[in-house]
Amino acid sequence: MKKFLFSFLTALFFLTACKKSNDEVIDTEYPVIDVTAQDAFPKQCSVIKRGEKFVFHAQFSDNVQLGSVSVDIHHNFDHHSHSTEVSDCGFDPVKTPVKPFLLIQDYPIPAGQKVFQTTAEIMVPADIDPGDYHFLIRVTDKEGWQTIKGLSIKVQ
């Protein structure tokens, strides 16, 4: 009986002492939006022309894996802020929008990327209201962490 009890307790000890190795690292870092490169566009205070295309170019990075990126262009005729702009560009007078430009667009990031450069053509309609606009960039990593960068731009 003692041998059985000893064998049972020894087996129980080894079974409970074996811990499943969980080397999975939990991602707690926000992804990064980089618009400082020479060819990045738009940048703070960039001017965009009505009726013309421009190329959105930025670099995104994450410590584990990027998920998605989206752009939101909307008017700033009321001088609101998203608290991400580093400086203002000198506002036009406050005005009521008649036909403002609004664009909300997702851009794909291939799976498994830690660094990605986006290059996307955006057409600005010719008949929109000129003035102050915000160009918001949102990048989300696979874990769900999101970084937002707001740029003040002018549409002429």
Language model features with spans:
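Bacterial Sec-dependent N-terminal signal peptides
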Residues: 11-39
